[in-house]
């Protein structure tokens, strides 16, 4: 019986497999010592290549209608584990080890929650290679300009991102409304930013700074209770224009800014 894609799970499977899948394997630097977490394996197109190349692969799939297909294809593989659960709810510590690498075509409608889940488990996950909407990929990897936002800085706080390549929408079934991007996130081995400023403080200021993207940094930071004069004084100390928008401020400048506000 033909599989019916479910909109509620954001299912868009690759149909021009070889060209894209081989490129994914190549840029993800797969080797036989890798332990892989694949989120949303679908019908197992990427899984088929990974399972033959890595030490261990754990696939997390929410759609029960795909369980039989996946078990039939891969249950004989000793290095393969299928977890039929919602990736946002599952305790990944039960299934993956330190040094795990994520390689996945993730459901686009929950991109941010999945990235947050990966970040929450960064003590186990060293690197993530994921397919996302092109626009989201550009935002995550943007070094400056209007594409930058809270998600950009959230990723930068924990690791380095890179836009690897674009995948046209025609390569998927059903064809989505947008092109896709394959990106990487490599987590820092040290806590380079966490050692400078806590997560709570960092995100408190970043969320305020981006609370209204049409407003400049001064008008957004007043939501934290500071006067405009105080904000302008501190911005002047670190050579940021009072008319600047948050999207044009680097993570290092943000941390410098927060430290002054917090008297550190």
Curated annotation (Swiss-Prot):
Lineage, broadest ranks: Bacteria, Fusobacteriati, Fusobacteriota, Fusobacteriia, Fusobacteriales
Assigned EC number: 2.1.1.182
Alphabetized Pfam families for the sequence: RrnaAD
Binding-site list for S-adenosyl-L-methionine: 12, 14, 40, 61, 86, 105
Catalytic activity: adenosine(1518)/adenosine(1519) in 16S rRNA + 4 S-adenosyl-L-methionine = N(6)-dimethyladenosine(1518)/N(6)-dimethyladenosine(1519) in 16S rRNA + 4 S-adenosyl-L-homocysteine + 4 H(+)
Record's subcellular location: Cytoplasm
TM ranges: none
Protein name: Ribosomal RNA small subunit methyltransferase A
Family under the similarity heading: Belongs to the class I-like SAM-binding methyltransferase superfamily. rRNA adenine N(6)-methyltransferase family. RsmA subfamily.
């Amino acid at each position: 019986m033909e599989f019916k894609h479910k909109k509620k799970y954001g299912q868009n499977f690759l149909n021009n497999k070889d060209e894209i899948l081989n490129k994914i394997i190549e840029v993800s630097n797969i080797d036989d010592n890798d332990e892989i977490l694949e989120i949303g394996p679908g019908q197992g197109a990427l899984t088929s290549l990974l399972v033959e190349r890595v030490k261990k692969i754990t696939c997390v799939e929410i759609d029960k209608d795909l369980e039989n297909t996946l078990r039939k294809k891969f249950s004989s593989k000793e290095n393969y584990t299928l977890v039929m659960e919602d990736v946002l709810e599952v305790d990944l510590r039960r299934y993956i080890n330190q040094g795990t690498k994520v390689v996945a075509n993730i459901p686009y409608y929950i991109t941010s929650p999945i990235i947050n889940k990966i970040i929450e488990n960064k003590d186990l996950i060293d690197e993530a290679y994921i397919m996302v909407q092109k626009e989201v990929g550009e935002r995550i990897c943007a070094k400056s300009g209007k594409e930058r936002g809270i998600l950009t800085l959230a990723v930068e706080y924990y690791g380095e991102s890179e836009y690897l390549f674009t995948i046209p929408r025609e390569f998927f079934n059903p064809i989505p409304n947008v092109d896709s991007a394959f990106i990487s996130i490599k987590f820092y081995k040290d806590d380079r930013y966490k050692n400078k400023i806590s997560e709570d403080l960092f995100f408190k200021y970043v969320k305020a700074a981006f609370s209204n993207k049409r407003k400049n940094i001064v008008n957004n930071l007043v939501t934290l209770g500071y006067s405009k004069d105080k904000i302008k004084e501190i911005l002047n100390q670190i050579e940021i224009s009072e008319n600047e928008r948050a999207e044009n401020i680097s993570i290092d400048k943000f941390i410098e800014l927060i430290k002054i506000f917090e008297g550190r």
